[in-house]
Regions:
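Short linear motifs centered on Gly/Pro in flexible linkers and helix caps
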Residues: 1-3, 100
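Short intrinsically disordered terminal tails
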Residues: 2, 12-14, 188-189
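Intrinsic-disorder-associated, low-complexity terminal segments enriched in Asp/Asn/His/Tyr and depleted
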Residues: 5-7
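Non-heme Fe(II)/2-oxoglutarate
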Residues: 9-95
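Catalytic core of non-heme Fe(II) oxygenases with the double-stranded beta-helix
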Residues: 67-189
Length: 189
């Protein structure tokens, strides 16, 4: 699926890979994560693209297991560990760790900009188990819409253009996600 592009950052991935994994966590663990995220206090004023006007809510979890644990987000690190072993991410993506974990949140009227990410892969976990399809709020990645579904993980090449999709004004819930920015093992040196 590689397209010609003069951007060397884009071409270094050149895979245009998008993978979707459902039922990532066991049900009881997915419920615990969903409940933990619903209790958080969010900080507004984060932009998905520097110098762009649209903002959303954001929380940095940490750059490694120790930072995540110290900040009270050990469960976020556990999502990564579970998915990594369950789906053999080291073999499939050559990934064994992350650059950072953070969370984003949106409501109706809060729409991030289309952007690319640093690193080699981006992984987005959707924690809300009560999210309904008609709420919208999926993720647009390189021309493909990935619907928001609780306990789903989306993995894609970081250089692909992507954005959270709008949330319906009939939705009175906070659209939350946990994001893992990853690099290939050989790039971690």
């Amino acid at each position: 699926r590689c397209k010609k592009n003069t951007d060397s950052f884009y071409e270094r991935a050149c895979l245009e890979m998008i993978d979707v994994y459902d039922d990532v966590l066991e049900e009881h663990n997915a419920i615990l994560v969903d409940d933990a995220i619903k209790q958080l206090s969010w900080k507004y004023d984060y932009s998905s693209q520097p110098k762009a006007p649209n903002k959303h809510w954001h929380i940095l979890c940490g750059h490694n297991e120790e930072e995540c644990t110290e900040a009270g987000y050990d469960w976020a690190h556990s999502i990564f560990q579970t998915a990594m072993y369950k789906y053999k991410f080291t073999e499939k993506y050559d990934v064994d760790t992350y650059l950072r974990i953070y969370m984003n949140a949106h409501t109706h009227g809060i729409e991030p900009h289309l952007h690319t990410d640093d690193g080699d892969f981006t992984m987005i976990y959707y924690p809300r188990l009560d999210w309904m399809l008609e709420y919208g709020g999926g993720t647009y990645i390189d021309g493909e819409l990935i619907e928001y579904k609780g306990n789903r993980l989306v993995v894609f090449d970081a250089p692909l253009l992507h954005s959270a999709m709008p949330v319906s004004r009939e939705c009175y819930q906070l659209r939350t996600c946990v994001v893992f920015k990853c690099t290939k093992v050989n790039n971690n040196v």
